[in-house]
């Protein structure tokens, strides 16, 4: 028979936050949508970021989960806010996104796979818009859309490089207008981004209508509202717009909702989930995708500005293995104090990035069994020399108990003065915004624009996008736009290859390097190790 986890009924988890049963729409005994409007925010927001990760990630999600459990052990009413996992990484390189060991969110298998169907709804809404666009072409193209200038892509929640660039509409006149097209990962779509930033249904519909999908032969932009797509898209998204409530392995509340990637979108959970968490809990721990150059930068420059959510403290997650990696060690699973010492340059840059926005980070060292005492001492000394709070985190092995010291440092940090400041004024030019991010956050010497990017920049200015904040899509495994540059690269120039106005989401996406919005699978994907036993239990997804 299928093994049932020893979990609390979701009604009991909700009761910890004062949520009554009639505010829940249940998806079985352990998952629920939260109904109604969020109460006025009263809680304090703790943002969790990290140093540049190795391909496997450094345990930012695990640390955030364990921190919430530790805060409850200290008598604090805390809630977790995370993004939903994408099937791309689940079956690709990283695996699931529900934490690991004793610091997990549950029911993890359901969350990692179909969950409450939110990603299906987003995917369907994107593909409906595509279908309406292609149908418009087929039915006479009254708007005069240029098939060569269609920006919209279809969506799929799977890493499948073969679908990046395709030709559709083949087979004769009855099968549509032939044109080039492609797919992107659902979490890279503009619909996912605007779902994460919309405040209510009215705002959601306004944002959907503002999505630019193509240009006419005369160069005039065409929006989703021009295709009369908004109402049907909103209907598909109605249930998905409601935040999901689940629990940690210790039975504490976790809001998990929406999932824009940190390297190709803005990289944090939905505004609705954060507002519910902040309205119901005293402390909210929220994760920002990847490292400070991606998720944190975008949170401070885009999310905080758009939503008004401003952190009270920042946790910076580091690991010994990542420091070895950035110190030049390929076999980063073995002790190497020399490599760790060299790799501290990467940690130093991420500390500086947090400080750019007005905060002193709490350094959380996510512990692994291979960590040597000498290596740990190097990181502790680094923090002490700079007057930064430091705590080892052993939540993977010990759950909330292993995060008590970190929780204490975070509570102390909440009382420290901070002054949130964005990196650039919104009235600055798009070039100046990109230059500020590249030089001050990445450490680049300058920015180079391709001819295609220059043309896109000119069009963006003409369309009135210059007052929007910038979201950079770039490699996540380096501070630069070159994924092979480890540590703290210096003397490099980043190259802008393209630019897109995302008026629905409310930002401009700037593409750097060879970033793809639809990843491919590795030679040995995580999918090879996943199975279902004779009794229906999932195997190979316990991280």
Swiss-Prot record:
Q: What highest taxon heads this organism's lineage? A: Bacteria
Give GO terms for biological process. tetrahydrofolate interconversion
Recorded catalytic reaction(s): these are: (6S)-5,6,7,8-tetrahydrofolate + formate + ATP = (6R)-10-formyltetrahydrofolate + ADP + phosphate
| Listed pathway(s) | One-carbon metabolism; tetrahydrofolate interconversion
Q: What gene name does this entry carry?
A: fhs
Which PROSITE patterns does the entry link to?
FTHFS_1, FTHFS_2
Q: What is this protein called?
A: Formate--tetrahydrofolate ligase
Tell me the protein family, please. Belongs to the formate--tetrahydrofolate ligase family.
Recite the UniProt keywords alphabetically: ATP-binding, Ligase, Nucleotide-binding, One-carbon metabolism
User: Which Pfam families would you find in this protein's record?
Assistant: FTHFS (PF01268)
């Amino acid at each position: 028979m299928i093994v049932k986890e020893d979990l609390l009924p979701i009604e009991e988890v909700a009761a910890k936050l004062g949520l009554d049963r009639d505010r829940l729409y249940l998806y079985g005994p352990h998952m629920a949508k939260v109904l109604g409007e969020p109460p006025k925010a009263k809680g304090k927001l703790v943002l969790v970021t990290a140093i540049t990760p190795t391909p496997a990630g450094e345990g930012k999600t695990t640390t955030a989960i364990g921190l919430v459990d530790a805060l409850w052990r200290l008598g604090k009413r805390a809630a977790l806010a995370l993004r939903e996992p994408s099937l791309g990484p689940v079956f690709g390189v990283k695996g699931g996104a529900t934490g690991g060991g004793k610091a997990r969110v549950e029911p993890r298998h359901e969350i990692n796979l179909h969950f409450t169907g939110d990603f299906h709804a987003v995917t369907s809404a994107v593909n409906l818009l595509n279908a309406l666009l292609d149908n418009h072409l087929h039915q006479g193209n009254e708007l005069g859309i240029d098939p060569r200038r269609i920006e919209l892509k279809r969506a799929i929640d799977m890493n499948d490089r073969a679908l990046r660039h395709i030709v559709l509409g083949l087979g004769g006149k009855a099968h549509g207008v032939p044109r080039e097209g492609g797919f992107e990962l659902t979490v890279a779509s503009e619909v996912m981004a605007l779902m994460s930033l919309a405040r209510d249904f009215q705002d959601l519909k306004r944002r959907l209508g503002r999505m630019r999908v193509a240009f006419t032969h005369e160069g005039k932009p065409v929006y989703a509202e021009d295709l009369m797509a908004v109402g049907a898209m909103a209907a598909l998204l109605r249930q998905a717009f409601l935040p999901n409530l689940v629990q940690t392995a210790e039975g504490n509340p976790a809001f998990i909702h929406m999932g824009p990637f940190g390297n190709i979108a803005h990289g944090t959970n939905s505004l609705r989930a954060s507002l519910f968490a902040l309205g119901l809990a005293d402390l909210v721990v929220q994760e920002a995708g990847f490292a400070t150059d991606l998720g944190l930068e975008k949170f401070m420059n885009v999310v905080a500005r758009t939503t008004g959510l401003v952190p009270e403290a920042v946790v910076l997650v580091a690991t010994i293995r990542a420091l070895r990696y950035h110190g030049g060690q390929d076999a980063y699973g073995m002790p190497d104090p020399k490599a760790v010492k060299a790799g501290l340059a990467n940690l130093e840059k991420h500390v500086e990035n947090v400080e750019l926005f007005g905060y002193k980070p709490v350094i959380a060292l996510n512990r692994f069994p291979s960590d040597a005492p000498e290596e740990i001492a190097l990181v502790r000394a680094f923090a002490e020399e700079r007057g930064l709070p430091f705590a080892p985190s052993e939540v993977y092995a010990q759950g909330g108990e292993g995060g008590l010291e970190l929780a204490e440092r975070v509570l102390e940090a909440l009382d420290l003065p901070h002054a949130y400041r964005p990196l650039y004024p919104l009235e600055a030019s798009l070039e100046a915004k990109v230059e500020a991010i590249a030089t001050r956050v990445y450490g680049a010497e300058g920015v180079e624009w391709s001819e295609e990017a220059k043309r896109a920049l000119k069009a963006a200015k003409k369309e009135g996008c210059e007052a929007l904040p910038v979201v950079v899509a770039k490699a996540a495994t380096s501070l630069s736009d070159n994924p092979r540059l480890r540590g703290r690269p210096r003397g490099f120039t980043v190259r802008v290859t393209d630019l897109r106005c995302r008026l629905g989401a409310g930002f401009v996406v700037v593409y750097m390097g060879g970033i793809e919005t639809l990843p491919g699978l590795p030679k040995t994907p995580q999918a090879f190790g996943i199975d279902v036993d004779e009794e229906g239990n999932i195997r190979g997804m316990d991280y």
